């Protein structure tokens, strides 16, 4: 990733800032998923696949930075500790560098076409998330599909395109499912951690929209808590009791059922791939071994 920045950014101060952002990354799961899909679909040039993965990781990093700036959270991140205008400019620089790197591979014009498609979808999903467009759970799931699923589809479909030269709709489909799995799992654990951005901005998360249906007294009480910030933060001091409230309101069961539904959708789609059983199992292991507590869209 640093090599790509070095090749495209001549401003030394900006380069050093971008290097520090890259160094702060703890995982490179999108690049890993790109390379995995490239290999299982028959690709053999790992050098090219690695360069594609690095370009995609740069795009994801730019997306993470812009997401944090827009949501005004993740305050421990380096880009949230400096002037916001400087961070925004750095994010746009990374975005441009990432696209330039992918375009320069010049292997298949379809790769760049689909990268732009998924980036465009993710931005529109992010817009709907910021503006609280979702009024129903189905609308929220569609926003999640666009905002999160599109980025995972970007990594996986690009890897397949590099290997085969052809777009694979099945890969796109299960990538969207994976995005939904990652986000709804993250939303649940963020609720337990007291993410101030979601609460302060009264975000129309899937859980919030579920609670608004007021299935029982417990869901009404929980919605009241979330709508009154001081009471919500105070209730989080006793995590065990708060978790009991989530169970009584049906939130825990609701999220568990949704996770299982989309997990099975993901598995079913993977089984439709024209690949050996061992390769299908490898994809399942990669996609479905997400970590509890993940709050971002991860592969």
From Swiss-Prot:
User: Which GO annotations describe the biological process of this protein?
Assistant: establishment of competence for transformation; isoprenoid biosynthetic process
- Pfam families xref list: polyprenyl_synt (PF00348)
Entry superkingdom = Bacteria
Please indicate if the UniProt record lists Kinase as a keyword.
no
Could you list this entry's UniProt keywords, alphabetically sorted.
Cell membrane, Competence, Magnesium, Membrane, Metal-binding, Prenyltransferase, Transferase
> What is seen without this gene?
Disruption of the gene prevents the development of competence as well as the transcription of comG, a late competence operon. Disruption also decreases the expression of srfA, a regulatory operon needed for the expression of competence.
Q: Which residues bind Mg(2+) 2?
A: 67, 71
Catalyses: L-tryptophyl-[protein] + (2E,6E)-farnesyl diphosphate = (2S,3R)-3-farnesyl-2,3-dihydro-2,N(alpha)-cyclo-L-tryptophyl-[protein] + diphosphate
Q: Which GO terms describe its molecular function?
A: metal ion binding; prenyltransferase activity
Locations listed in the record? Cell membrane
Q: Does the keyword Cell cycle apply?
A: no
InterPro entries tied to this protein: ComQ, Isoprenoid_synthase_dom_sf, Polyprenyl_synt
Q: Which cofactor does it need?
A: Mg(2+)
The UniProt record gives the binding positions of Mg(2+) 1 as 67, 71
Q: Name one GO cellular component term.
A: plasma membrane
Q: What is its EC number?
A: 2.5.1.-
The induction annotation reads:
Expression is maximal early in growth and declines as the cells approach the stationary phase.
Cofactor info, note text: Binds 2 Mg(2+) ions per subunit.
Annotated PANTHER family = ALL TRANS-POLYPRENYL-DIPHOSPHATE SYNTHASE PDSS1, GERANYLGERANYL PYROPHOSPHATE SYNTHASE
Entry function = Part of a major quorum-sensing system that regulates the development of genetic competence. Involved in the maturation of the competence pheromone ComX. Acts by catalyzing the transfer of a farnesyl group on the ComX pheromone. Shows weak geranylation activity with geranyl diphosphate (GPP).
Q: What is stated as this protein's family in its record?
A: Belongs to the FPP/GGPP synthase family.
Tell me more from the record. Answer: The DNA sequences encoding comQ, comX and the N-terminal two-thirds of comP show a striking polymorphism, which determines the specificity of the quorum-sensing system in the different pherotypes of Bacillus.
List the protein's name. Answer: Tryptophan prenyltransferase ComQ
Q: Name the source organism.
A: Bacillus subtilis (strain 168)
């Amino acid at each position: 990733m640093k090599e790509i920045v070095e090749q495209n950014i001549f401003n030394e101060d900006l380069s050093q800032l971008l290097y520090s952002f890259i160094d702060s990354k703890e995982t490179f799961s999108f690049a890993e998923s790109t390379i995995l899909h490239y290999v299982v679909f028959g690709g053999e040039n790992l050098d090219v696949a690695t360069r594609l993965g690095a370009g995609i990781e740069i795009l994801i990093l730019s997306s993470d930075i812009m997401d944090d700036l827009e949501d005004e959270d993740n305050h421990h991140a380096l880009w949230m500790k400096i002037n916001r205008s400087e961070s925004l400019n750095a994010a746009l620089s990374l975005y441009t560098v990432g696209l330039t790197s992918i375009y320069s591979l010049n292997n298949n014009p379809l790769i760049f076409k689909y990268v732009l498609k998924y980036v465009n979808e993710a931005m529109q999903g992010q817009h709907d998330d910021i503006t609280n467009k979702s009024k129903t759970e189905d609308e929220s799931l569609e926003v999640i599909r666009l905002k999160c699923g599109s980025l995972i589809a970007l990594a996986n479909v690009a890897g397949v395109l590099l290997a085969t030269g052809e777009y694979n709709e099945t890969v796109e489909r299960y990538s969207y499912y994976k995005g939904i799995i990652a986000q709804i799992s993250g939303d649940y654990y963020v609720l337990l951690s007291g993410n101030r951005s979601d609460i302060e901005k009264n975000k129309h998360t899937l859980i919030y929209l579920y609670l608004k249906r007021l299935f029982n007294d417990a869901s009404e009480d929980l919605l009241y808590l979330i709508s009154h910030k001081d009471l919500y933060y105070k209730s989080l001091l006793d995590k065990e009791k708060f978790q009991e409230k989530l169970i009584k309101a049906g939130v825990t069961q609701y999220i568990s059922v949704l996770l299982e539904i989309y997990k099975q959708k993901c598995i079913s789609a993977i089984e439709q791939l024209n690949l050996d059983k061992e390769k299908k199992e490898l994809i399942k292991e990669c996609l479905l071994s997400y970590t509890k507590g993940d709050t971002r869209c991860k592969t």
